Amino acid sequence: MKKYDRGWASLETGAALLIVMLLIAWGAGIWQDYIQTKGWQTEARLVSNWTSAARSYIGKNYTTLQGSSTTTTPAVITTTMLKNTGFLSSGFTETNSEGQRLQAYVVRNAQNPELLQAMVVSSGGTPYPVKALIQMAKDITTGLGGYIQDGKTATGALRSWSVALSNYGAKSGNGHIAVLLSTDELSGAAEDTDRLYRFQVNGRPDLNKMHTAIDMGSNNLNNVGAVNAQTGNFSGNVNGVNGTFSGQVKGNSGNFDVNVTAGGDIRSNNGWLITRNSKGWLNETHGGGFYMSDGSWVRSVNNKGIYTGGQVKGGTVRADGRLYTGEYLQLERTAVAGASCSPNGLVGRDNTGAILSCQSGTWRKVGSGELQIATAQATGWRFPGATATCPTGKRVTGGGGICTSRTGYIWLTRSFPSANNSWSAACDTTEDQNGSITVYAICQ
């Protein structure tokens, strides 16, 4: 069977394929334009970041740049300068994707030379197409974005402004980027560095930093979390709950209502450690120390003993109890036996070391009291004998006896101490007759 419509089918298939190919080519063009646009937007963001860093640098160094620029001679800011001063990260490249290098040209305003204005210009590398320049000029967010199309003039986005590059001492070529930083923009940057912000600004810690002294005009600084400082001078009182100091605390005087605790020593160079109200020094660990509770005596806390390997020296030393010595009692001054003394009961020594005591107002040797003679008499047949006894409290130190008879013949046959306080003696007449004896006891 003949097929009369076969040619028309082939024609329809070819037309469909042609349409598909046209759609693919059109879509590829749109995709390529999209990729280009995204790339130019990225370039615009990089230029915005660079311009923002230059703006901050100018604000920070406003006075310095005023001194290094004129209305026709610019101060030039480079990428290296921004990286070295921390306004750009160290990884920021010196050139963009087309090999162009950004620089800022800062000059004084011709109408008001006290103010600055600047132009950011790219130079070198490969020129951008006009479409890219127009797109990037609109997407730049810092300053007034623009471009250079004739190599001499910077033109703003949507042709909103136009400035000759020579006004800024800048040079470039066709197909390059330009950003205008007006006098008002840079004045705001300078104010940013001078103004102390109440809130944190991300990426701008310098806005919360003082660069000079602040005068509160006798007003308060309230609700401070922490004060970190190198030194502090106060003409009045400093009140607080706790204080920690890693170094020294100095002052003319200090008053504390409760306790002062130190981890180390407490020293006074030329003053006293003064306490009041019957208080003094106390060792908390062992419960000892010194205090005064009257105007006469320094007392030991809890009646603790005082121990030293050195000397304890004073005008007088009094013991209400016994006085002990682990060695000897050394009396340095001497007295003379027979000399007057007061009061009775004093103990001393003479120059030979003999012990003296004050008795009845006179220095006497110990054991050498007043002598007293005790006597006893007896009469008996041929062998008379007797014993003389000392008064109470006296001791016998010697003695003897005397014998007598009618005929004169009699002998002292015995004479001896018969006890600690008596002396005995006896006689012999050798004849049958009576004899008499008198016995003497020397008592002291």
Swiss-Prot record:
Span list, region Variable region: 362-444
Keywords: Plasmid
Region (Constant region): 1-361
Miscellaneous comment as given in the Swiss-Prot or TrEMBL entry: This protein is expressed by a shufflon (= clustered inversion region that works as a biological switch). The orfs of this region share a constant N-terminus, while the C-terminus is variable.
Protein known as: Shufflon protein B'
